[in-house]
């Protein structure tokens, strides 16, 4: 055995290649010359040998890793015929073992189903095998704490069970080197071979076992080790400070010497003391003295006569992106000015996952060819998504979510548009499960105009069903046959047949060719490899568990465990690329220029890992019992120092070390100790700060990478800033290159364009809305909030995707419908609201709610147990509302006149009509939930109720700005149609009267007045009490908790007619002083103030109508305090409102106090609003019959007609137009 020993850069690998070259030249047809290197370095070493101008080829030379060496041995002497269960297969087997033996475990029982547990156990068992620890050794541990003993016994059990599962039909790759070592003596190609072992700093016990076996067959084994020769010459038993980085190579050297002596092999040394790699004095000094103590300062640090004597530069950066941008600019500068090839440069970091995404984005933008040296996880590949979602679809009986995940993988022969339309249809009508199966066509669209679209959807459904149903039938368990009877092999076969039916291999080949044609060679490699990798996983599943009967949930869990760990290793697809890798896994042994990224504390050096089944203390205890495992703790610290040493000594000519000063959130980051050490060794070390806002012409990146910064500077220009001379020149250059950079035209267009909408042409606005503008309160309120939102919803008629779920509007509709039908039932039975007991009212609510529940959202309330329980809660909520309304009836004399009465053209009540300019007019329509009336003396008073499924408040401030006009508009409509209401309802004849008043005999002589308008919340309040409440008191308190909100007439007699106990009113929210006066802040208005409100309504309707017909669609959302129109707006992705743009500004609405409100309303430029505004047309018998029909004097038919969207769930207005 011969050792080549030397520090970094002394030429160990070069000497190995030279010796191989010399041997092959002297004996061209001799025995194999084997170069044994780490797995990740095989491709690089093959390239080095092949491109060596002196080698003349590598006919005798073979570059092998230990794994490839095993394949060669098995191919010559046999023993490799068993199916290989790889890492993915082992994790699947272990997941199954955990599920099967959970009851036999104590330590690992609770975490048996935890994600990642199978990974930890697989790593532990692999470590046992690599370090040649047997289950019996684990069981033989004594005199340890109970937890450690239990843990080792359970691991020994799982270890043995895994070996049993593999059986005689399969083998574990972790066992291969042990098998290889036993067969090396029979391998002809190793008899008398010369072997060079290069690139290792240490070996596992299995690898040492293989080397020991080769000592008996090889003519000579040469091992190169990164070790200071002085350490061997001195023979010192302990390491001095700074020498710990050679800890592992020295331990390895000692182990190899022991093997050689045991084999009675001769031992010789080649000590390399001269460094040949470094072309800069600074790099040479860094290698020799980085770990030397006391510190050896670079003697030529201030020598200004030599051009760049150091070859080292520091790049502090604002953040990670600025750091990577700066590295990319420097790479392009090196290529442009110094003629560097891309392969001359490497980028390494200790935190590759943290930098990978940024590197990909930035290097692609700069058009820098690169290769990321890491294994790619493929769990998010469409093929893996297809496998997992297909199984879940069967498992969950064709549920929507997994089924459409499956369909969106692009493997089904349906366009994305067809899949999207199908998804919208299924979401809207809650289609899942059995609805997909059979030959019954879907016909959920009620509109016959959709027949053609329905036919297309059924065609798509049939294609999907024909492809997927055989898979469903093949793997679905059959309980009628005595339980699940499907084996793993059968499920796997069904999966394979599904993949073939969907032509997955052909799709993958197309994707690979497309990636190749656009120059993405790494992506092409991945698409070419993914099919074989997935089939390998399925083969391993069958090899390990093929005949085992398994239910789908366990199968899915095991397959997911395997696919989550599936990773693909790619070889560099091109020759001239920048190599990007991790500090502990880089293929490039040396490079001309190296960029070391992320030199921050906690990253460089990395923190020792404590992941695994055993913690550091347990490992030490096992070591004391003779169980030697992978080094941890202090040894990991030494290993981190070695990684830093190799990174700092890899560059021949130039070393750049960069580090961000802040993280993504602007928090400061600490610099690595490596930086402090470098500054001690090189006091004059140059630094260059990297920023995203670069103004130096010499540092300009590739034009494509400049485009984001170009857009940023154009944005600043748009906001009024000026461009620097440099960016003026850049802009002129881009404007001259628009053919090559089409994005420039879009960016420049963005500079000129304004994110604003002007006005629609008036003819178009009139065509869109009509000469007689028929509208609703909800539409005008939306227009008041934001004209563009109104245009999007009612002009463009955009709507959100329908979803089969019970939304707040659905619950509001349910409440309205039940309350309406409950009132009709009372009227038919001649009952008053306050007459029924609690039990009687609950029975009547049940009777009226059941048929309504059948019609809501395609019977959604009956679709599952959750919704059936929710139905009960909704009934309970309505029942409480009924009890509160009954209390109103008991306490007052106001009677329900009409229910859900509509006003508008051709409706029971006439519309509110406002003349507009140019002969146009606005007609307001809507539907009033409930109109109550009372006759007091010779006066008739009307009160409006509007049901809300939430707490609702109305204020004069909201009314002034048009944000809440519903109650006011309804009151105005009721007063305009009052004569129709009174004559059709028989109010005068049926009035209960009030104290001190008698019913009127002639309503024609009565004057009709507003009594108020109120929001009634349909809610079931939850009470808090520190004492136990009896049922009767609880019922009273819950009724008191429901507060109506609105404004009432400031007339004591009228208020007494609403609540006899006015002084202690719990129903109206009115507070009185001791003298009987109304307290300040009570929600009361005089009749003159009600008239002013109606005047303001007319003014607002006129202004809104004029603005609508003038085509106002401006993006001007309101803002008042913390509230804006954008908070819950669905159209934000459409309008792109940005308050930072100069043309995008909120309409700031001032908060109008009550006193100011009345001042403003009185001064509005409008004709005096008459106390009794006449109806638009004289009501005739037709209007009265319509009111009787629509007002609800007869029960509803079997089909429930759902209305608009006026409230969150209780919309009542038809928002069409004439």
Curated annotation (Swiss-Prot):
Cofactor(s) listed in the protein's UniProt record: Mg(2+); [4Fe-4S] cluster
CC cofactor note: Binds 1 [4Fe-4S] cluster.
Biased composition, class Polar residues, residue ranges: 1160-1169
Spans annotated as Disordered: 987-1006, 1160-1218
Biological process terms in GO annotation: double-strand break repair via homologous recombination
Residue span(s) of domain UvrD-like helicase C-terminal: 281-588
InterPro entries (UniProt xref): ADDB_N (IPR049035), DNA_helicase_suAddB (IPR014140), DNA_helicase_UvrD-like_C (IPR014017), P-loop_NTPase (IPR027417), PDDEXK_AddAB-type (IPR038726)
EC number annotated for this UniProt entry: 3.1.-.-
Binding, ATP: 6-13
Keywords of this entry: 4Fe-4S, ATP-binding, DNA damage, DNA repair, DNA-binding, Exonuclease, Helicase, Hydrolase, Iron, Iron-sulfur, Metal-binding, Nuclease, Nucleotide-binding
Single GO term (MF): 5'-3' exonuclease activity
Binding site for [4Fe-4S] cluster: 786, 1126, 1129, 1135
Residue ranges, compositional bias (Basic and acidic residues): 1209-1218
Keyword ATP-binding: yes
Any Pfam family matching the protein: UvrD_C
Protein family (similarity comment): Belongs to the helicase family. AddB/RexB type 1 subfamily.
Additional facts recorded: Despite having conserved helicase domains, this subunit does not have helicase activity.
Protein function: The heterodimer acts as both an ATP-dependent DNA helicase and an ATP-dependent, dual-direction single-stranded exonuclease. Recognizes the chi site generating a DNA molecule suitable for the initiation of homologous recombination. The AddB subunit has 5' -> 3' nuclease activity but not helicase activity.
Subunit structure, as described in the record: Heterodimer of AddA and AddB.
Official protein name in the record: ATP-dependent helicase/deoxyribonuclease subunit B
The organism of origin for this protein: Desulfitobacterium hafniense (strain DSM 10664 / DCB-2)
Gene this chain is encoded by: addB
